[in-house]
Amino acid sequence: MKFLILFALVAVAAAGQVKFTDCGKKEIASVAVDGCEGDLCVIHKSKPVHVIAEFTANQDTCKIEVKVTGQLNGLEVPIPGIETDGCKVLKCPLKKGTKYTMNYSVNVPSVVPNIKTVVKLLATGEHGVLACGAVNTDVKP
């Protein structure tokens, strides 16, 4: 399991452009999720989800901490089983102003409820928010 349901990656043939909300400072250029296009991304539990994201680093950093959450009853709830070390997905250090592509693959844990929610990925570097994006998601069995 790896980084960003939301950030810079290598092309996956079936990936479609997904509408996303940038909750950072416009670092993210694009997000593509395997099998998804448009406003809502349907994902299935216990099946791999491939994400490709492009972003520009807003800081020099030697570490990246990743947090992926889903909204549940108005609360941001961490999604279990997500790799939190972004340097395992991207080669650190990152250089400010450089464009990166991240290829992230993760199995949606079976404990995640069947729900329409907003999945948010927050990547933090040594000097604060590195990138943040959110995608409307429908989790199904």
From Swiss-Prot:
GO cellular component, one term: extracellular region
Disulphide bond pairs: C23-C132, C36-C41, C87-C92
Cleaved signal peptide residues: 1-15
Keyword terms, alphabetized: Allergen, Disulfide bond, Glycoprotein, Secreted, Signal
SUPFAM superfamilies found in the cross-reference section: E set domains
InterPro entries assigned to the protein according to its UniProt record, in alphabetical order: Ig_E-set, ML_dom, NPC2-like
Subcellular location: Secreted
The keyword Secreted belongs to this UniProt entry's keyword annotation: yes
Keyword Disulfide bond listed: yes
Gene Ontology molecular function, alphabetical: sterol binding
A GO BP annotation: sterol transport
Sugar-modified residues: N103
PANTHER family registered for this protein in UniProt: NIEMANN PICK TYPE C2 PROTEIN NPC2-RELATED, NPC INTRACELLULAR CHOLESTEROL TRANSPORTER 2
Family: Belongs to the NPC2 family.
Protein name: Mite group 2 allergen Tyr p 2
Organism name: Tyrophagus putrescentiae
